[in-house]
């Protein structure tokens, strides 16, 4: 999540109503701070800790607030690989483009001068068996070997985004990561091309859904909207709709319209009509 209006109601549901205490709500606005990262690294309710493996000294306030993106550095690195590949692999890992290597060997480097991202084109190597076990929709003809994250045009990656990348690097598709649909594109961490909508949240997948066009998991979204979500109160003429609540209602209407359109495109007309 990103703002108060899409976060506090979820905290209420978990804290007071005991709903989905196995899931972890993470507010990206707070993820720039060390005290909130501390909380994310601890279990809460029935949820295990968020997969952030940094030590506190590595993210304490004033440290790694922003990591410069310097794509020109990669040319030098590749030249070093040609000259002395074994030594360089020990220093910066097997693949200079790989997200986990970049975090471990560059971003977390003890030398402040080397705490950079040496490329604007990052890859995440995909564990295909883990993807098959994950239960996510296969949003492509085949599972890709790698996932590409483009940082073109970015001058720096700030701490909250870096924490998102750390979660992605560590989770290995065994724990699903979602972004609320109310989060603005500026906070996607350049991962928007890999989202699959399942309801009020988009699941991060290894599939480039912008290329495949498979951006909606109609089975999960239909089940959520028709069976799992609870709606009520709007038929009460005395119910006050303020600006914020009105926007939320419009968001839900758009969800139904989007799902109906996709169901029709997939030939599932009966389900579309039930919406």
Please place each PLM-identified region on the residue numbering.
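ER/secretory pathway lumenal C-terminal domains and tails of membrane proteins involved
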Residues: 2, 6-275
